């Protein structure tokens, strides 16, 4: 039986289509452009890779620290959508600003801000899943989001890639081509968000109290105490913190790593484009498998696969190796992201 999305579910899925364009930009074009800026400033490949890794880590750390309180505030009536919009604006405006940063250090600072805005929006976006669908549909809806995100993000990426690779033919500089690419990505991101902003209504919430921020901290403390009593929830949260960071590290660092190894930039971009097309059907497949098998077991399969992928990445020595890596990442990337999101939403009470 064909799985059909409701209007609210479609609006929610479209945000994945929008924000995935930024994710693809971060994992493909952005590291190569930063390498270009770094080389012009006299930085070595070792320094370039290290600084890029530091920036990604700083953004991850900031989001990890602010995540719990943001998640708690998201449950307060009337807070989720406005703070989501603020995070979106920070991410999108910073994305555009990256195109005008010609200094490598300034570029990194803006990148960290863009990453924080992007990741912050996902905290509120993921929490919207319980508001737009039923618990028995979450695995499929979450998988559809990632699947269409992978394939939909290819549209602005391909347009940007054509402009960048054909900059000489068009008669524009590399810097101008990159600026256009950042603007295209941010515009796509914002446009794909509009249906969600129009159709989303918060269904589950706790009533707003006079001092909402203070109450959010108090509720966060209570939630942590409750989580400690729930062994299953506690262990998943602990594991999730580590394995999902590993997944995103591989996504963020893949192109930078390949570029530092001296692999052809065009080949790297095309390989990661293939990752998107491979990830599309497998994200949907994992969503359907979750209807027959336990999500926990499927997540474990993906974790083991990602461990093998990380080990294989240590021995990359050619373009062919990178293509093999890209294909296997595509197979398991959608599954581990989609199932983790829906499983997390299902085991956590809607108002916590």
Predicted regions and their residues:
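Helix-loop boundary and gating motifs at the non-cytosolic
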Residues: 2-60, 232-271
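Helix-to-loop junctions at the C-terminal end of transmembrane segments
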Residues: 65-79, 281-295
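Structural signature of the two symmetry-related core transmembrane helices
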Residues: 82-97, 297-312
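Juxtamembrane intracellular "pre-TM" segments in multi-pass secondary transporters
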Residues: 2-10, 201-238
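C-terminal membrane-cytosol helix-exit motif in multi-pass small-molecule transporters
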Residues: 156-168, 186-205
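Glycine-rich segments within core transmembrane alpha-helices of 12-TM secondary carriers
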Residues: 142-164
């Amino acid at each position: 039986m064909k799985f059909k999305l409701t209007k609210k579910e479609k609006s929610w899925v479209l945000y994945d289509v929008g924000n995935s364009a930024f994710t693809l930009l971060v994992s493909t074009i952005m590291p190569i452009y930063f390498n270009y800026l770094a080389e012009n400033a006299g930085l070595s490949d070792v320094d370039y890779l290290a600084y890029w890794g530091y920036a990604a880590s700083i953004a991850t750390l900031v989001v990890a620290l602010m995540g719990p309180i943001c998640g708690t505030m998201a449950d307060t009536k009337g807070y989720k959508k406005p703070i989501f919009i603020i995070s979106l604006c920070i991410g999108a405006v910073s994305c555009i600003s990256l195109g005008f940063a010609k200094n490598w250090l300034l570029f990194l600072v803006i990148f960290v801000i863009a990453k924080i805005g992007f990741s912050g929006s996902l905290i509120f976006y993921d929490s919207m899943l319980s508001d737009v669908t039923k618990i028995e549909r979450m695995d499929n809806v979450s998988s559809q989001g990632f699947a269409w995100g992978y394939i939909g993000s290819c549209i602005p990426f391909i347009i940007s890639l054509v402009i960048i690779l054909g900059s000489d033919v068009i008669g524009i500089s590399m810097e101008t081509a990159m600026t256009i690419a950042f603007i295209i990505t941010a515009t796509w991101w914002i446009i794909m968000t509009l249906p969600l902003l129009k159709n989303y209504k918060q269904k589950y919430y706790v009533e707003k109290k006079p001092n909402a921020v203070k109450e959010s901290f108090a509720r966060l403390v209570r939630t942590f105490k409750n989580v400690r009593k729930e062994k299953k929830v506690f262990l998943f949260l602990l594991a999730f913190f580590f394995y999902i960071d590993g997944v995103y590290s591989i996504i963020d660092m893949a192109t930078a790593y390949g570029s530092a190894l001296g692999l052809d930039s065009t080949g790297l971009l095309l390989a990661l484009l293939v990752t998107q097309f491979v990830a599309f059907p497998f994200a949907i497949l994992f969503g359907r498998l979750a209807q027959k098998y336990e999500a926990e077991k499927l997540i474990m399969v993906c974790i083991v696969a990602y461990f093998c992928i990380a080990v294989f990445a240590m021995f990359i020595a050619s373009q062919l190796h990178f293509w093999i890596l890209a294909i296997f990442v595509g197979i398991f990337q959608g599954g581990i992201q989609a199932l983790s999101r829906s499983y997390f939403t299902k085991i956590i009470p809607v108002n916590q």
